[in-house]
C-alpha cells in the first residue's frame, strides 16, 4: 500500500510538471512542432537513466522512493501516447516530413538523454564528475 500511495502522489506531481513545462515550451516555441512533448520526454529520459543507474549502483535511493520517482513522477511527466497522437495528427495533416522528424528525433534524442543520465550517475557515484 505504501508503494502504491507513493507512486500515486509522485505521478500527480509528474503530471502537473508535464502540464506546466510543456505549456511553457509551447508558449516559447509555438505548436508547429511538438516541442513541449519532446521536451518533457527528453527530461524524463535523462532522469530515468540517472535515477535507475544510481539505484542499481548504490543505496542512495531507497526502493520506495525509486518507485515513486520512476513509475510515478517519470510516468506522469513523460508521455508516449501524446507523442503518438501528435505524430499521427501531423501525418493526417499531410506534414510527413515534420512527423518523421518528430518520430526520429524523439527516439534518438530520448535514447541519447537516457545514456547521458546513466553516464552522469556513474560519474557522480565514482566521484569523478
Swiss-Prot record:
Catalytic reactions on record: fluoride(in) = fluoride(out)
GO CC terms, sorted: plasma membrane
GO molecular function terms listed in the Swiss-Prot or TrEMBL record: fluoride channel activity; metal ion binding
Activity control mechanisms: Na(+) is not transported, but it plays an essential structural role and its presence is essential for fluoride channel function.
InterPro entries in the cross-refs: FluC
Taxonomic superkingdom: Bacteria
Gene Ontology biological process terms from the UniProt entry: cellular detoxification of fluoride
Transmembrane segments: 5-25, 32-52, 60-80, 99-119
Residues involved in Na(+) binding: 75, 78
UniProt keyword list: Cell inner membrane, Cell membrane, Ion channel, Ion transport, Membrane, Metal-binding, Sodium, Transmembrane, Transmembrane helix, Transport
Record flagged with keyword ATP-binding: no
Keyword presence, Plastid: no
Membrane association type: Multi-pass membrane protein
Cellular location(s): Cell inner membrane
Function description: Fluoride-specific ion channel. Important for reducing fluoride concentration in the cell, thus reducing its toxicity.
Matching NCBIfam families: crcB
UniProt similarity note: Belongs to the fluoride channel Fluc/FEX (TC 1.A.43) family.
Protein name as catalogued: Fluoride-specific ion channel FluC
Species for this entry: Pelobacter propionicus (strain DSM 2379 / NBRC 103807 / OttBd1)
Gene: fluC
Amino acid at each position: 500500500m505504501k508503494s502504491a500511495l507513493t507512486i500515486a502522489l509522485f505521478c500527480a506531481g509528474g503530471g502537473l510538471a508535464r502540464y506546466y513545462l510543456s505549456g511553457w515550451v509551447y508558449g516559447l516555441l509555438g505548436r508547429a512542432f511538438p516541442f513541449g512533448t519532446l521536451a518533457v520526454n527528453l527530461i524524463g529520459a535523462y532522469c530515468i537513466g540517472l535515477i535507475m543507474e544510481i539505484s542499481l549502483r548504490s543505496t542512495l535511493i531507497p526502493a520506495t522512493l525509486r518507485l515513486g520517482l520512476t513509475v510515478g513522477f517519470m510516468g506522469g511527466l513523460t508521455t508516449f501516447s501524446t507523442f503518438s497522437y501528435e505524430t499521427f495528427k501531423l501525418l493526417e495533416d499531410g506534414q510527413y516530413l515534420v512527423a518523421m522528424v518528430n518520430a526520429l528525433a524523439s527516439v534518438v534524442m530520448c535514447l541519447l538523454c537516457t545514456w547521458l543520465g546513466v553516464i552522469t550517475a556513474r560519474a557522480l557515484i565514482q566521484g569523478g564528475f
